[in-house]
Amino acid sequence: MQSWFQVVSLTYRKAPLTVREKIALSEDEAKSFMLKVKDFFDVSDLLVVSTCNRTEVYVNSSQSLTTELIKLLLIFKGISDSEEYLPYFEIFENSEDTIRHLFEVATGLHSQVVGDMQVPNQIKRAYQASADAQLAGPFLHRLMHTIFYANKRVALETEFRDGAASVSYAASDLALSLVHQPKILIVGLGEIGQDVCKNLVARGVTTIQITNRTRKRTEEVAGELGCEVVEWEDLDKAMAKSDIVISSITRSEPLFTKERVAEL
């Protein structure tokens, strides 16, 4: 039986931030959504990629599922008016086009910072989630390993990722262009937060404070990079003394509001 590898894609290229925020999936939500797709549709492979700039659902199926996938995703996120949101999505229903699109996404060609080095890790985590859920068949396994091999060749054999090849590098670049010898506070020490910290240290910034909801992670990063630890409870005090605050916290609601900043 013939099958089609297809994708529905919501990205910064067509959707504003307010829309992307509503539809973005946390890691736990992505896992739950994959099980929903499995329950509703006959798919042999399923991959869900969701970051701050994109939410994409790839499936391999014997029938076209793109419109149904979008509707299911919107319902899953509590959005009932699918007609309003359909124009924000890009759809690829041809297997060759979908494969090419995934290759381009995985190598960072479609990232806001072209060549973003964090994208391959995001794709790997999405693939691991598919494998853990028994939703990666022979086709997806072979495709993903081919993509990882291609990514390795890009990194080793080309200069594609030279320069500001990540959001974290671009953030540190912007910070240093705004203030001379800034006092910087980094809030959140996930992959991006740690990368920002490393980039700033590598570029000679000496006054860096860091804080994280998990104390252990803060101490580990501080010990590795020589940054000053700020207790999470003292976040507002540290903000008031900082020239620049860089946040990479994953939350459903904003951590920093206009009202909170006004009270500093």
Predicted regions and their residues:
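A glycine-rich (often HGG/GG-containing) alpha/beta subdomain
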Residues: 1-111
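N-terminal loops that bind phosphate or other acidic moieties
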Residues: 14, 20-32, 173, 195-198, ...
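Conserved active-site and cofactor/substrate-binding residues in soluble primary-metabolism enzymes
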Residues: 28, 32, 64, 68, ...
